[in-house]
């Protein structure tokens, strides 16, 4: 039997469009089984943690973020804020809230990746066992640092926390739709991948790294 070009193109189009839909359906279906994480990991020894927080002109939010975060630290832990090309008083506020602060001024090399690299070089002077990257505008739920640290140390690989966006009611329907799409992308799909035994993407905040991975 032969297949004409039009039919072949039709099957190719269906496969191209249908495959992502099938993958998404599978991820959502498997995610419905819930979180199958093991609580045994939490019984492991608590590693020494450094929370690395890049911050560019975050004076409006950084104090609130640090007040929620610092009580979660254990003895030997620390928070390092990289005040990156700031034109406000981010550094002063972070220092008064109890964080260690380093200032970075380099207007040719801008961006989060440069700030993180700068912070890692500073941490290397007294290397922690686990580095957790948290953005300055994130709300860190109670207990999150401890769980991330233990998971990362036990598995000796990067670990991503649940990272959600909360849309103010004033944003109306478009904001609520965006928040729902964010939940599917950052919660449902990664949970499905986890239950299937696959890795999920790292999202740039709420991410823990073993020091052995960071230093390379």
Regions found by a protein language model. Name each.
Residues 83-91, 106-108, 138-139:
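A conserved acidic beta->alpha catalytic loop
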């Amino acid at each position: 039997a032969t297949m004409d070009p039009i039919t072949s193109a039709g099957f190719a189009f269906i496969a191209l469009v249908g495959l992502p839909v099938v993958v998404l359906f599978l991820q959502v279906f498997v995610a419905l089984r819930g979180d199958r994480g093991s609580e045994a990991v939490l019984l492991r020894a608590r590693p020494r943690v450094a929370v690395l927080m890049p911050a560019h002109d975050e004076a409006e939010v950084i104090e609130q973020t640090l007040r929620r975060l610092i009580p979660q630290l254990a003895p030997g832990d620390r928070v390092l804020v990289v005040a990156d090309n700031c034109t406000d008083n981010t550094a002063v506020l972070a220092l008064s809230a109890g964080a260690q602060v380093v200032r970075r001024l380099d207007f040719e090399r801008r961006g989060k990746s440069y700030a993180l690299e700068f912070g890692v070089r500073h941490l290397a002077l007294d290397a922690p066992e686990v580095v957790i990257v948290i953005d300055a505008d994130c709300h860190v739920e109670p207990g999150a640092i401890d769980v991330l640290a233990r998971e990362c140390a036990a598995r000796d690989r990067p670990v991503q926390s649940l990272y959600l966006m909360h849309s103010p009611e004033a944003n109306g329907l478009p904001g609520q739709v965006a928040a729902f799409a964010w939940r599917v992308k950052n919660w449902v799909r990664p949970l499905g991948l986890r239950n299937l035994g696959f890795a999920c993407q790292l999202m740039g905040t709420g991410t823990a790294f073993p020091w052995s991975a960071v230093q390379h």
